[in-house]
Swiss-Prot record:
tRNA nucleotidyltransferase involved in the synthesis of the tRNA CCA terminus. Adds the terminal adenosine residue to tRNA. The keyword Calcium does not apply. Its EC number is 2.7.7.-. It comes from the Bacteria. This is A-adding tRNA nucleotidyltransferase. PANTHER family: A-ADDING TRNA NUCLEOTIDYLTRANSFERASE, POLYA POLYMERASE. The keyword S-adenosyl-L-methionine does not apply. It comes from Halalkalibacterium halodurans (strain ATCC BAA-125 / DSM 18197 / FERM 7344 / JCM 9153 / C-125). Keywords: ATP-binding, Magnesium, Metal-binding, Nucleotide-binding, Nucleotidyltransferase, RNA-binding, Transferase, tRNA processing, tRNA-binding. ATP binds at residues 49-52, 136-137, 141, 181-190, 194, 225. GO terms for biological process: tRNA processing. InterPro entries: NT_sf, PolA_pol_head_dom, tRNA_nt/polyA_polymerase. Pfam families: PolyA_pol. GO terms for molecular function: ATP binding; ATP:3'-cytidine-cytidine-tRNA adenylyltransferase activity; metal ion binding; tRNA binding.
């Protein structure tokens, strides 16, 4: 261990904690890798969420390693000695090694980062562990454990992450952190929710004080990066609280130009209840933000990356237009207007509605789900009708009559079809 970094190492040794929280396979692997790195005159460290969770008493998960040296060369050396497969990610100086029984670890060269402009992806250069930890989002994620045989188990904690863990604080590492990478705000709120922590006061103040710059920085972040963070946020146990916290920090205004109001919170709560313990779909979750405000659809379009999400937005717009122009809401009339709209956007819309409209749409969806059409196109051809656009009208209208209760059996349905084609009634 070089003298220039000794001041960063916590006096506590975490060997006992490692033995308690890591599997035997992981422990043996880490010791072996530390020895291999030492023989190559390199320092190897366990970093990130595994260290954080160990200190919280939570069993370790994935192994993320940082080496003061060439991660690509070291990972290849690991594969040569221990077997397994290695995949290099050369632009980022990272590698993934998979060994026997699916033992997996990610190895990264220690590096420093600089940002050409707020929100942009960073430029990296090789460096030491302290610089590598300094590029991370929060102090609780900026700790490492030394794996060198002479220092094995020593905690590297230059930003006092262990203190913040003990006190339940989420703290950024420098004043430009949120501007350099605005997605850190989303991650911070996720950790606040997951661990029941709070933002350290200066961190909270900086989040609020940097709003104009934050809006500009977010414009440089790709929708895919933001979507990734939103998906993770929606897998937490209390997304409503997280979305409300993002509103308090003005993130929704900066990101979408929309407001997560009390009605948005009610809408999201109803959506979550409908999931029966399953994670929320991230796109439906953010669609509750400023739902049906004037610029709602335009604000969400950049994040509607898949065809399914694009159709969802279009379906909601169609529902809104049709319901706005309707003067009666009987089930059969609703069916004429909404029969082509899938159940999911209808449920979403219903959950945003007032009590009366929600009851109307719930009843329609229930009856539509129970509907078993008594007529088919084959039936119409057997009646001597030639296929035409009127087939679709006839089949739809007979479903409406079924919902109304005027068609109760097959004979009623066939009689309806005969009369329809005799009169060629349009919709």
């Amino acid at each position: 261990m070089s003298e220039e970094h000794q001041e960063s190492y916590h006096s506590d040794n975490l060997i006992d904690l490692m033995n308690h929280t890591l599997t035997n396979d992981h422990l043996q692997l880490l010791k072996k890798l530390g020895e291999m790195a030492a023989k190559l005159r390199m320092n190897l460290f366990l970093v990130g969420g595994t260290v954080r969770d160990m200190l919280r008493g939570v069993p370790g998960g994935d192994l993320d390693l940082v080496i003061e040296g060439d991660a690509l060369a070291f990972s290849q050396n690991v594969a040569n000695v221990l077997g397994g497969k290695v995949k290099h990610h050369e632009p980022f100086a990272t590698a993934t090694w998979v060994g026997a029984e699916n033992l997996k670890l990610d190895i990264v060269s220690a590096r420093a980062e600089s940002y050409a402009k707020p929100g942009a992806l960073p430029t990296i250069r090789h460096s030491h562990i302290t610089d590598d930890l300094a590029r991370r989002d929060f102090s609780i994620n900026a700790m490492a454990i030394h794996l060198h045989p002479a220092s094995y188990g020593q905690l590297v904690d230059p930003f006092h992450g262990r203190h913040d863990l003990t006190n339940g604080l989420i703290r950024i590492l420098h004043s430009q952190s949120f501007i350099d990478d605005p997605t850190r705000l989303l991650r911070g709120v996720r950790f606040v929710s997951r661990f029941n922590y709070r933002f350290e006061q200066k961190t909270a103040n900086l989040a609020l004080a940097t709003q104009p710059a934050l809006t500009n920085a977010l414009a440089n972040v790709s929708p895919e990066r933001i979507v990734h963070e939103l998906k993770l946020l929606c897998h937490e146990t209390d997304p409503v609280s997280s979305f409300s916290k993002l509103e308090d920090l003005h993130v929704w205004q900066a990101l979408l130009g929309l407001t997560f109001s009390s009605s948005s919170a009610t809408h999201l709560s109803r959506l979550q209840e409908e999931q029966n313990g399953e994670p929320l779909h991230w796109f439906q979750a953010i669609a509750t933000v400023g739902f049906l405000e004037d610029n709602w659809k335009a604000s969400l379009v950049p994040f509607a990356i898949t065809a399914m999400e694009q159709r969802f937005l279009q379906n909601i717009e169609d529902i809104q237009k049709r319901l706005t122009n309707m003067t009666r809401f009987s089930t059969d009339y609703l069916h004429k207007q909404l029969y082509q709209v899938p159940e999911e956007p209808l449920r979403f819309y219903a959950l945003s509605s007032g009590e009366e409209m929600q009851k109307v749409l719930d009843l329609y969806l229930h009856q539509r789900k129970q509907l078993q059409p008594l007529l088919t196109g084959h039936d119409l051809m057997e009646l001597g009708m030639k296929p035409s656009p009127l087939f679709k009208e006839c089949l739809l209208l007979h479903e409406c009559e079924q919902l109304k209760g005027t068609i109760e059996n097959k004979q009623d349905a066939l009689q309806f079809a005969r009369e329809f084609f005799n009169h060629k009634q349009p919709l």
